[in-house]
Amino acid sequence: MSRYFPHTPYAEDQPLSHVILTTHVLTRAVTTGSIIGLILTSVRQSIPSLRRPGPLSEKLLLSATRNTIITTAIVGVGLTARMWGREPIEWQDRSWRLLENRGQLETDDWTYGGMGGALLATGLMGVRGAGGPARLGWRGVAGAAGIGSVGGMIGYMAWRYGINGGKFVEKDKKGERKGI
């Protein structure tokens, strides 16, 4: 998503800075909340006295949704508190830096791809009558999107650090000569 926002050569010219920074923060809140939900549910399931009846998949989806909502609320308040009264250039600078960072753009691509894939799978399951997360209503769909964002983040980490060794392919700059 980040790569679709306009990106200027200079930070002070960056448009949509509030939207860019808020979108970034809320997207990270979805992934963080889902990870917290997955960890809490896994711990509860591993301790027999805390284990509740019901399918694990439902517990994971609902826990991911609940923790995503809580995390998004906390992070939203944190963003407001952190950026309250800041000059527009500070919003522009932070947004510009996000758009300038190739790793951040790649993380966003993978995260949104994971969310989209999970939502597509949820929709297909619902259309085919297989149930899936959609049978839990909006909470199941939101949980699927959150877990998809975690899957996308894991895919990004495997791609960037496993396959590519953490390095980016360097692009030739116009006017630069390659080595002798």
Q: Which ranges hold each PLM region?
A:
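Membrane-penetrating hydrophobic segments
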Residues: V19-T32, L61, T65, R102-T111, ...
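Membrane-interacting alpha-helical segments
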Residues: W84-I180
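Hydrophobic membrane-targeting alpha-helices
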Residues: S42, S46, T80, M157-Y161
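Membrane-interface helix-loop junction between the first two transmembrane segments
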Residues: P6, S42-E58
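Intrinsically disordered, low-complexity N-proximal targeting/linker segments that flank membranes
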Residues: M1-L38, G54-P55, A158-I180
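Alpha-helical transmembrane segments of multipass membrane proteins
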Residues: L40, I70, I74, G78, ...
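Canonical alpha-helical transmembrane segments of integral membrane proteins
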Residues: T32-S42, M115-G123
